[in-house]
Amino acid sequence: LEADDIIACCVRHIQKTQPNRKIYIITNDHDYLQLINSNTTIYNLQNKNLNNKSCGDPKKDLLLKIIVGDKSDNIPKCFKKCGNKTALKLINNPELLQKKLQENPQSKILFERNTQLIDFSYIPHELQEHVLNFISC
């Protein structure tokens, strides 16, 4: 469990239990884009709103990060020579994405691995409960 996982647990808990509460996350890490909603705003350390870096859909932001990887976190791209533009084409055409993953078993393995590493919904429930119990002390 890393710091971003703990923050994600807290944010999701607040979003669920207090849906109208405003949440501000200050970070340079784009992993948090998957948590954006109408009441959750992300600012970088230079006080710039990162919500503008979003695709407009947290699920698409998540898929983009899964496909293009993240060098700073040592997460490789799923496909060689695949940047944001190509990844967005795949995201907007799920059938094509699935076809590409089926054609390239190594890409499929990377996609599944990246999903587990990046997607906050893969945080085991028992760890989420430990985090929430700890912060409620």
Predicted region positions:
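Extended two-metal-dependent nuclease catalytic cores across DNA- and RNA-processing enzymes
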Residues: L1-S136
